Amino acid sequence: MPWRPPAHSVPGREGQFYAATFHAHAAFCGCGGFIEHLNSIHPRFLGAGGPPPPPPALRRALPAPEGPGGPPQHAPPNPPPEGDHQPPRRGGGAGGAGDGHAGDGDAAEEYGPEDLDLLFAAAAEDDMSFKAPSSRHQTRGPGRRAKKRLRFSPGSPRQPRLGGESRRSPSPRRTSTPKRKRGATPQAAPAAKTTPASPQTRTPSPVRRRTQTEEGSPHRPPPYIAPPPIVEDLLFPNTQKKKKFSKFDWETEAQLAACFDRPMRFFPSDLPTYPWLPKKPTTQTTFRVSFQLKAPQ
């Protein structure tokens, strides 16, 4: 039976290869670690592998199956162009009509010394086109007007700043020392004029403080009395249901019943009964009360 290519995809073939090697290892070794086993014995067989295997051959497509009309008819190749209008090869030169591999050795002789100027000009043109500024970075031309600065006309004169003169002085600022007239005696520099601080335009409002509440005033909040802490009544718990015996209580009750010769109780709140004690005699108490009231004289 001739060989046929596998019908599975690449992930399927990889999975089947891994499963085959895994089960092959499990057939003769029971360590359970296939990868660790290979890593442990790999250093011992580094030089025994031999030369590397040859690269896999290219797989060619299988011929198409024959249809009802016989084998498929392939179109004949295009005829070569007539005349000397054949496409030039990349190898260039006079031997362009020869074998296609003949121009590989003459790749260095493709351009002559007379073509260097054209190559440098083309490279410079490409460099200039690459460095040309784009449309978004174009400088502003003379015909384009700049944006005007927004200026607001104040409706009311500005108020002077507190604690000194205004920020901008009305007098122009000097940038150089004035020239001295000929024959004039130098005078002492006048003392710096200090401008007193401008008084406040309005009187400050008085600070309002909360009036102190009297000691016996009824407007004071009542004192807070915290509720007493809750203390559970351990001796007489206020529960509707009777407390049941635990395992330890049952054992203690059995020991007490055997010690005092009495029956066991079912609930801890029940009173114990002692049948061997003498019964209390039943007595009927009868008495007569007589009194006499005397009126005051």
From Swiss-Prot:
Sequence ranges of Pro residues compositional bias: 65-81, 219-229
Stretches with biased composition (Basic residues): 137-151
UniProt feature, compositional bias: Low complexity: 184-201
Compositionally skewed regions (Acidic residues) per UniProt: 106-117
Chain intervals with Gly residues compositional bias: 90-100
InterPro entries documented for this protein: HEV_TT_vir_Orf2/Gyrovir_Vp2_N (IPR004118)
Domain of life: Viruses
Stretches the record annotates as Disordered: 46-229
Protein name per the record: Uncharacterized ORF2/4 protein
Lineage: Viruses, Viruses incertae sedis, Anelloviridae, Alphatorquevirus
